[in-house]
């Protein structure tokens, strides 16, 4: 896997409590479990999200430099359901278009009494850089390049825990564009921290890690043996925007070789769950019958994403 870009002391205060969420590397099982437990407490017995006044004295700014539907909207809803004031910064018409440095823009917003920034950016490590030089606010990484997507990994862990109860003895397959996926990078870290030892990465060799210690994960370039008796299947899309044109697979050929079809899903355990971080490309990485089937928990992941983001915001604000 790639080199860790997170200096963990930046994420934690002297008491070991989270003040930023930049990535999951170096965070303990206790840290992750605390977030999952907090998120669970924000979901009622009917599966509906509770409202909270926890952040009613706070202002949160969303800075999304990459397109997003699920992540941006769930962060906004999470902040609103926690009673925070939310600002979606109009980057297309901001001073950044006049070549203002991002840190200067954020310092200006901080002077407007912003307490927390949610950042998505194509540059690996940018939220870490901002957290290092911008004091007095919390930084929440909503995805940086191919490096990390901590809240997606956490919401995936929440969804898994709701169905499987424990992470030990699980077999988890991650299928798709592994090398370009920040979801895979953070998800593997979360699974290992929570005790999962059978993690299987399934992808064409060109989309697989160049190197990965065999003691940590198993790598497959054939989907069928990789899926055998799995408890959880996480499907990833082809991230064409991050690929060199010559390396972009033919979609039909990819589906024929690596698409999750009902026949292939039948190789997993009968109670296996199917997950996808979205957006879904039907007929490329997953068959619609599987995406909409009774083993799919894709829409539950979206709801769980709001709960996780509420939990993280409240924890960062020292409200939990």
Swiss-Prot record:
PROSITE patterns in the cross-refs: CARBAMOYLTRANSFERASE (PS00097)
Binding annotation for carbamoyl phosphate: 70-71, 120, 149, 152, 278-279
A biological process from GO: 'de novo' pyrimidine nucleobase biosynthetic process
Any Pfam family matching the protein: OTCace
Protein's UniProt keywords contain Transferase: yes
MF-aspect GO terms: amino acid binding; aspartate carbamoyltransferase activity
EC number: 2.1.3.2
Gene Ontology cellular-component terms listed: cytosol
PANTHER family tied to this protein: ASPARTATE CARBAMOYLTRANSFERASE, ORNITHINE CARBAMOYLTRANSFERASE, MITOCHONDRIAL
Family per similarity comment: Belongs to the aspartate/ornithine carbamoyltransferase superfamily. ATCase family.
Subunit structure: Heterododecamer (2C3:3R2) of six catalytic PyrB chains organized as two trimers (C3), and six regulatory PyrI chains organized as three dimers (R2).
Protein name: Aspartate carbamoyltransferase catalytic subunit
């Amino acid at each position: 896997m790639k080199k860790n870009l997170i200096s963990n002391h930046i994420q934690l205060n002297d008491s070991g409590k989270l003040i930023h969420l930049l990535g999951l590397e170096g965070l303990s099982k206790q840290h992750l479990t605390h977030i999952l437990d907090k998120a669970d407490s924000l979901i009622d017995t009917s599966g509906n999200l509770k409202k909270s006044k926890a952040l009613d004295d706070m202002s949160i700014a969303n800075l999304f430099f990459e397109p997003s539907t699920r992540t941006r909207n769930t962060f906004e809803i999470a902040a609103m359901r926690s009673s925070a004031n939310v600002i979606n910064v109009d980057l297309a018409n901001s001073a950044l278009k006049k070549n203002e440095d991002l840190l200067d823009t954020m310092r200006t917003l901080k002077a407007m009494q912003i307490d927390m920034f949610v950042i998505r950016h194509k540059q690996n490590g940018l939220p870490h850089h901002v957290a290092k030089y911008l004091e007095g606010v919390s930084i929440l990484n909503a995805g940086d390049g191919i490096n990390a997507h901590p809240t997606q990994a956490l919401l995936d862990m929440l969804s898994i825990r709701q169905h499987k109860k424990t992470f030990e003895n699980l077999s988890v397959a991650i299928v798709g564009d592994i090398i370009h996926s920040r979801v895979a990078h953070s998800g593997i870290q979360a699974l290992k921290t929570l005790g999962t030892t059978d993690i299987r990465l399934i992808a064409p060799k060109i989309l697989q890690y160049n190197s990965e210690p065999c003691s940590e994960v198993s790598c497959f370039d054939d989907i069928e043996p990789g899926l055998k008796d799995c408890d959880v299947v996480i499907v990833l899309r082809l991230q064409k925007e991050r690929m060199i044109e010559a390396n972009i697979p033919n979609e039909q050929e990819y589906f024929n070789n690596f698409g999750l079809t009902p026949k292939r899903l039948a190789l997993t355990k009968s109670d296996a769950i199917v997950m996808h971080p979205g957006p879904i490309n039907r007929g490329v990485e997953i068959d619609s019958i599987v995406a909409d089937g009774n083993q799919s928990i894709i829409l539950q992941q979206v709801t769980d994403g709001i709960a996780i983001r509420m939990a993280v915001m409240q924890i960062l604000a020292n409200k939990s």
